[in-house]
């Protein structure tokens, strides 16, 4: 089974479309969607309505949530799947990519990371300020944590991995960069990167703020002291053609 963990905060306008697209992308796959919701609006009600149509949908509503990273971690704890994925609810991570991530996992990967920065990828859904901010965060992370240096897009929030990767990991996430935590503390030997095109947000509002940047720097400082220095891994980069091989 594949468990898709999705943290939500006031994303009511995107939920129905998101679930419908995931269902199409994962046709033929045994999957579940685990929403971990910190919303102040009617997002929980929308999720429960959608769950009547899609029984694969589950939700954990947190009245006193402590941010995206802890929401995802709670979702991992609830997940039943052999494979676990994380993605945003705002549709900037196109759900169809889940199909190709799953394909990479079935090929023998321990970790699959869609990248905006390899041939076939695109970060066009970011405005110029977000591109600078994202690039700076990526470079700082790679300087502070050697374990991130082989990964082209290590600060993304879109990824999939085998459950065993985090079974013995001491995850203490803060802020938003949950994949950085998993890469630094997990155990894995093969990473597959696949290209994807980051989309523009069409509904709802971005949740980024200056607080997110400060939390990220605090997270890096903490991880630098305790990341899994013994982990060794190889990275395999798939072209668009290889990724889509087998599509009808």
Which positions does each model-derived feature cover?
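Hydrophobic helical membrane-anchoring modules
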Residues: 1, 144-149, 171-248
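Cell-envelope/extracellular polymer assembly enzymes that use nucleotide-activated donors
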Residues: 1-3, 32
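Short, well-formed alpha-helical segments that are part of the catalytic scaffolds
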Residues: 11-25
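Donor nucleotide-sugar binding loop of glycosyltransferases
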Residues: 11-14, 39, 94
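Short beta-strand/loop segment that forms part of the nucleotide-sugar
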Residues: 29-40, 60-62
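A conserved acidic beta->alpha catalytic loop
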Residues: 37-46, 91
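Acceptor/aglycone-binding surface of glycosyltransferases and processive sugar-polymer synthases
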Residues: 60-78, 83, 95-176, 201-211
